[in-house]
From Swiss-Prot:
The record marks G181, S182 as: Cleavage (non-hydrolytic). The lineage of its organism: Bacteria, Pseudomonadati, Thermodesulfobacteriota, Desulfuromonadia, Geobacterales. It comes from Geotalea daltonii (strain DSM 22248 / JCM 15807 / FRC-32) (Geobacter daltonii). This is Phosphatidylserine decarboxylase proenzyme. One of its GO terms (molecular function) is phosphatidylserine decarboxylase activity. GO terms for cellular component: plasma membrane. Its cofactor is pyruvate. Its EC number is 4.1.1.65. The gene is psd. GO terms for biological process: phosphatidylethanolamine biosynthetic process.
Length: 213
C-alpha cells in the first residue's frame, strides 16, 4: 500500500506481463501486425498504471485530493453512510488520469462500507447513489471525520481498496485504485475552508481541497 517509489502500480504488473508476453510470442512467430498491436496495448497499460511521485503539502490541516481528475461537484450534501450533512467534493477521473488513489488526511479508519450497484456514467450525480462503491470513514487525531468513496464507472468495474478498520493512514500515501475511468466522492465537515472550485484540475496527494478548522 505504501510503494510510492515504484513507477508502476503493482496491481498493473500482471496486465503488463501478459500483454508483453503475447507481444513476444507474435514477434517470435513473425506476425508483425499482432505484435505491433500488443506492443501498443502494453504501452497503454504501463501508462494507465503509472505511479508518479507526489509531494504532499506540509500543512497537517490540509485535506489533499485523493485522485487525479477534475472537480465535477462541489457543495453541501447528505452523506448516506453517516446520514449527516457534509461538504461534498466529487472528482472525475478519465481513462487518461493516474488512477491511484491517495489518503486525503492523516487519520484512522473507523468504518468502511461496500455497496453493490450499477455502472452508470460517473459524470452524472445519480452515480453517487446507484453505482457500485467502496467507502472509508476516517477520523483524525482531533476527532474530525471525513468520508472518501470510490465509485465504479461505466468502464471502471474493479475497485481496489486496501485499508481495513483500525488502520492508521498517512496523508498522501496510496490506499487503492479504480481501473479505467471512475469517480471519487469526498465528504468534509461543513466548516472546512475550501480551496477548489468547480472545474478545477486536481492532483492526488498534492492539490489541497480544503483546510479543516
Amino acid at each position: 500500500m505504501r510503494n510510492n517509489n515504484v513507477p508502476i502500480a503493482v496491481e498493473g504488473l500482471p496486465f503488463v506481463a501478459g500483454a508483453a508476453l503475447i507481444s513476444a510470442i507474435f514477434i517470435i512467430i513473425g506476425w508483425k501486425v499482432g505484435a505491433a498491436f500488443f506492443i501498443v496495448v502494453t504501452v497503454f497499460i504501463i501508462f494507465f498504471f503509472r505511479n508518479p511521485k507526489r509531494v504532499t503539502p506540509a500543512n497537517e490541516k490540509a485535506v489533499v485530493s485523493p485522485a487525479d481528475g477534475v472537480v465535477i461537484y462541489l457543495g453541501p450534501a447528505r452523506e448516506p453512510h453517516l446520514d449527516q450533512d457534509m461538504m461534498k467534493i466529487s472528482i472525475f477521473m478519465s481513462v487518461f488520469n493516474v488512477h491511484i488513489n491517495r489518503v486525503p488526511i492523516s487519520a484512522r479508519v473507523v468504518d468502511q462500507f461496500y455497496r453493490p450497484g450499477k455502472f452508470l456514467d460517473v459524470r452524472h450525480e445519480s452515480a453517487t447513489f446507484e453505482n457500485e462503491q467502496k467507502g472509508l470513514v476516517l477520523e483524525t487525531a482531533n476527532g474530525i471525520r471525513l468520508v472518501v468513496v470510490q465509485v465504479a464507472g461505466l468502464i471502471a468495474r474493479r475497485i481496489v481498496c486496501y485499508p481495513t478498520i483500525g488502520t492508521m493512514l498517512r496523508r498522501g500515501e496510496r490506499y487503492g485504485l479504480i481501473r479505467f475511468g471512475s469517480r471519487l466522492d469526498v465528504y468534509l465537515p461543513l466548516d472546512t475552508e475550501l480551496q477548489v472550485t468547480m472545474g478545477d484540475q486536481t492532483v492526488a496527494g498534492e492539490t489541497i481541497l480544503g483546510v479543516t478548522t
